[in-house]
């Protein structure tokens, strides 16, 4: 039966998509209306069993939809229609005629919903979908209990709350009272229909605590024991309505002046905290920028003042790529306690590296050699619950964090990186600022002059050299074109996803590129008091990468500030080691130049 259901859902989805030109989300809305009509009919008059022609079937479908609008006015508006052609309606009802939804077991009903979710969200509208592995981890960390009130103020498909009910059901018998203790809130009517259908299919609930509303502008009568949420984030959906912003501390600057706009995830932090009972707990998925950006310190200070932070869990890069976004995110676990900042406490920092699926657009499950799902979030959960710490899962004092501008970046405190940096500082070391100067003066660009222009992509990360450039008039240069280069300058990328990795761009400027203009995505080091090869060698080490990782911030374009860069600790070697490094790099670069000239000669003249 499961295979038959899969085939029917797929055929219907493909038919509507091909014949109606609807997107996945619009197909979802049609599917839900049809499934509601069929379920409603089976529980009432069985009109569909009495149809004798396609015309009769079509008219019956219209009658059922009208009945639905009367029965569920909070779910269906008076203007709701199927919004597809008559023949498509007939096709869908015929495809579903071979099985009775109300006669299916709970598991099969749940499978129908999951199949719809997979087709409509995982394959199209991922912003409403949180990976099940992350949902499962969060629910186990929060540990919802029977009798507690829980909600998600931006519930999407309702995954968090359904998972919370499953968690409670693992040790208790689920009753109507348990379902009545959970609350769903979302702005989307279509998503509300999906949740209501799942509640009806799995729990027989016909009048759930399901509210179609914008949670940021709405008032709530209840306070909750736990809240689980992955609120919408990103600059594209910024809130600019002053009537909404005025309701939030985080909608204003420190002087109380309204921001012109604010991203929704920041407002949701405040909303969620306000909805918690004293002692209530919450888990919120947030972009890493909220944890680390210097300009976001007011957000973190607000959280510190209102809550006890229990844990910060760093999610892997690419966790949400299969679901529509590549933004790096972490999970914030809090307990509402405005007195928590008055005495120091420890905050757990954990890092999940594997979630059991591949981080690609067409994601697949990933397995270990023994056939088990390849994940390590269960291990992180165990370490948190049992206070087991290591280089990647550790605790930091709240006092240390508040003294660091409330920085909550996992990488800043990671024990593994700290050990590498400490190993440098236990020996002889300098700061980058002590051995060279930084070019800060921007070149005055003349619109008619021709320039060589160097971007990060013009660097060979394997050979640490500039391999190409663009030739552009001054008027054609982008606004980021900034610094004129001199021979033996060292340029190092301080922005982009590759910084702090083996693929970070760095190069020594050769005669060929003297006078070229480079992007401000580089820091330009000049007048080194030591051999540039010593610096170049250091920029290829794990010790350098660890310090960049500790200091970088930003989710869309990771960045390390120039101030943090020049403060990086640089090891000083003994004379013999320095001479060996300089000699080896000099030989390698000379051989590379000789090979380049020989190849150039061969290309120009050939061999007779």
What spans do the regions from the language model cover?
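A short glycine-rich beta-alpha junction/loop motif
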Residues: 332, 411, 515-523, 552-577
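Long recognition/docking surfaces used for binding and targeting
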Residues: 31-119
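A short beta-sheet element
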Residues: 487-539
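Conserved S-adenosyl-L-methionine
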Residues: 127-229, 234-238, 287-289, 298-300, ...
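Conserved Class I SAM-dependent methyltransferase catalytic core
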Residues: 196, 258-320, 325-334
């Amino acid at each position: 039966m499961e295979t038959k259901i899969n085939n029917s859902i797929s055929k219907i989805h493909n038919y509507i998509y091909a014949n109606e030109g609807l997107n996945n989300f619009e197909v979802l809305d049609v599917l839900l209306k049809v499934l509601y009509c069929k379920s409603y009919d089976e529980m009432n008059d069985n009109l569909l069993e009495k149809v004798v022609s396609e015309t009769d079937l079509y008219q019956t479908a219209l009658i059922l939809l009208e009945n639905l609008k009367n029965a569920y006015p909070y779910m269906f508006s008076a203007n709701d229609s199927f919004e597809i052609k008559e023949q498509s309606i007939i096709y869908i009802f015929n495809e579903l005629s071979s099985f009775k939804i109300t006669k299916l077991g709970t598991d099969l009903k749940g499978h129908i919903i999951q199949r719809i979710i997979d087709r409509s969200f995982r394959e199209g509208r991922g912003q409403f979908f949180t990976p099940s592995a992350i949902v499962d981890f969060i629910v186990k960390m929060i540990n919802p209990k029977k009798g507690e009130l829980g909600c998600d103020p931006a519930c999407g498909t309702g995954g968090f709350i359904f998972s919370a009910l499953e968690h409670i059901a693992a040790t208790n018998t689920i009753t109507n009272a348990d379902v009545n203790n959970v609350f769903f809130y979302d702005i989307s009517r279509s998503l509300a229909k999906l949740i209501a259908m799942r509640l009806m299919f799995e729990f027989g609930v016909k009048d759930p605590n399901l509210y179609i509303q914008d949670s940021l502008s709405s008032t709530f009568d209840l306070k909750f024991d736990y809240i689980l949420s992955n609120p919408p984030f990103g600059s594209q959906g910024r809130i600019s309505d002053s009537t909404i912003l005025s309701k939030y501390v985080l909608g204003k600057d420190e002087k109380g002046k309204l921001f012109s706009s604010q991203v929704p995830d920041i407002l949701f932090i405040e909303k969620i905290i306000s909805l918690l009972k004293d002692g209530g707990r919450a888990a919120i998925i947030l972009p890493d920028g909220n944890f680390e950006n210097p300009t976001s310190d007011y957000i973190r200070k607000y959280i510190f003042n209102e809550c006890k932070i229990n844990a910060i869990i760093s999610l892997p890069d690419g966790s949400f790529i299969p679901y529509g976004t590549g933004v790096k995110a972490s999970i914030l676990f809090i307990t509402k306690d405005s007195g928590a900042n008055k005495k120091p406490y420890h905050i757990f920092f954990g890092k999940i590296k594997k979630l059991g699926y591949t981080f690609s657009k067409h994601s697949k499950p990933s397995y270990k050699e023994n056939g088990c799902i390849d994940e390590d979030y269960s291990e992180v959960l165990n370490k948190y619950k049992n206070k087991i710490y290591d280089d990647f899962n550790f605790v930091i004092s709240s006092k240390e964090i508040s003294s660091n501008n409330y920085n909550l970046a996992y990488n800043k405190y990671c024990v593994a990186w700290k050990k590498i940096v400490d190993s440098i500082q236990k020996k002889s070391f300098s700061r980058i600022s002590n051995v060279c100067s930084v070019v800060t003066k921007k070149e005055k660009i003349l619109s008619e002059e021709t320039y060589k222009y160097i971007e990060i992509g013009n660097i060979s990360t394997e050979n640490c050299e500039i391999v190409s450039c663009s030739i552009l008039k001054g008027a054609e240069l982008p606004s980021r074109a900034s610094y004129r280069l001199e021979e033996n300058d060292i340029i190092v990328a301080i922005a982009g996803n590759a910084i702090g990795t083996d693929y970070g761009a760095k190069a020594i400027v050769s005669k060929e590129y003297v006078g070229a203009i480079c992007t401000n995505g580089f820091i330009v080091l000049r007048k080194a008091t030591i051999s540039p090869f010593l610096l170049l060698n250091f920029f290829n080490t794990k010790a350098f990468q660890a310090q960049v990782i500790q200091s970088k911030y930003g989710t869309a374009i990771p960045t390390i500030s120039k101030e943090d860069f020049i403060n990086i600790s640089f090891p000083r070697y003994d004379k013999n080691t320095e001479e060996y490094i300089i000699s080896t790099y000099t030989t390698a670069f000379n051989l590379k130049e000789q090979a380049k000239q020989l190849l150039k000669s061969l290309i120009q003249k050939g061999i007779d």
